[in-house]
From Swiss-Prot:
Family: Belongs to the UppP family.
Natural source organism: Shewanella denitrificans (strain OS217 / ATCC BAA-1090 / DSM 15013)
Keywords for this protein: Antibiotic resistance, Cell inner membrane, Cell membrane, Cell shape, Cell wall biogenesis/degradation, Hydrolase, Membrane, Peptidoglycan synthesis, Transmembrane, Transmembrane helix
Name under which the protein is recorded: Undecaprenyl-diphosphatase
Gene field: uppP
Gene Ontology BP, a term: peptidoglycan biosynthetic process
A family per Pfam: BacA
Top-level enzyme category: hydrolase
Extra remark beyond the main annotation: Bacitracin is thought to be involved in the inhibition of peptidoglycan synthesis by sequestering undecaprenyl diphosphate, thereby reducing the pool of lipid carrier available.
Length: 266
């Protein structure tokens, strides 16, 4: 791949992974508009790893505190806000793992197309708008509870459908369940860690077994750009989301979905 192509695709991955606007909808645009071939399995692994490293490093203190508290809850039975949050994150991960294994082949075969992505981009954008407008509660992440965590986990499982947006679906569910905008975003970002780690392990195994030639320079550039873009995205999103709300992302999703439908008809 050309350097411009590497940087653009890595930027798209890094910026859209944590914004509620669907990364799959954006990754399909370069191929549609510029006629680019698929970037290859190894490049997907690299840019996803970059995004995962960004969220892990950004929330390193939270994750370390949660991990220690979780271990203490197992060893000594000590419960704290951090240990409960860790358990809720684990619980919220289960539906995506089950649904992902069960429906992976069906989704890849039948739902990974522009029509589905355009439709879900618009539909789930409208759901995000409704949830943001109707939500009046200000619960923190430590007030989530296991029932809400499980429901948010089902939303994450639904986001396996291309165009839905994992962050968009989980934030929508969290807002509907009474979490504040900032809490909904933080819970969504923390949820991405176990899912991302699991996916990274699986795809790395597939990559090792793949006969695909590996361009390590391209992978390094892609991972770095994706990491920087994702880190900046998380920082500014959490900084401004309480005041800004979800409306700008909803409008953007409606425009993006319309553009994708226009490309279908073109």
């Amino acid at each position: 791949m050309e350097t411009f192509q590497i940087i653009l695709l890595a930027l798209i991955q890094g910026l859209t992974e944590f914004l509620p606007i669907s990364s799959s909808a954006h990754l399909i645009l370069p191929s549609q508009l510029l006629g680019w071939k698929d970037q290859g399995f190894s490049f997907d692994v690299a840019v996803n790893t970059g995004s995962l490293l960004a969220v892990v490093i950004y929330f390193r203190h939270d994750l370390w505190t949660m991990a220690k508290a979780w271990v203490l809850s197992l060893v000594k039975g000590e419960q704290s806000n951090e240990s409960k949050l860790a358990w809720w994150i684990i619980l919220a991960t289960i539906p995506a793992v089950i649904f992902g294994f069960a429906a992976k082949d069906f989704i890849a075969t039948h739902l990974r197309n522009t029509t589905v992505i355009a439709s879900t981009t618009i539909i789930f954008g409208l759901l995000l708008w409704w949830a943001d407008r109707m939500s009046r509660s200000e619960l923190t992440v430590y007030q989530t509870g296991w029932r809400k965590a499980l429901l948010i986990g089902f939303a994450q499982a639904l986001a396996i459908i291309p165009g839905t947006s994992r962050s968009g679906a989980t934030m929508t569910a969290a807002l509907m369940l009474g979490l504040s905008r900032e809490a909904a975003a933080k819970f969504s970002f923390l949820m991405s860690v176990p899912v991302g780690l699991g996916a990274a392990i699986l795809v790395t195994k597939d990559l090792v077994e793949s006969p695909e030639a590996i361009d390590y320079q391209a992978l390094g550039i892609g991972m770095l750009v994706s990491f920087l873009a994702a880190y900046a995205c998380i920082y500014y999103f959490l900084k401004y989301i309480s005041r800004m709300g979800m409306t700008p992302f909803v409008i953007y999703r409606l425009i993006l979905g319309s553009v994708l439908f226009a490309l279908i008809l073109w």
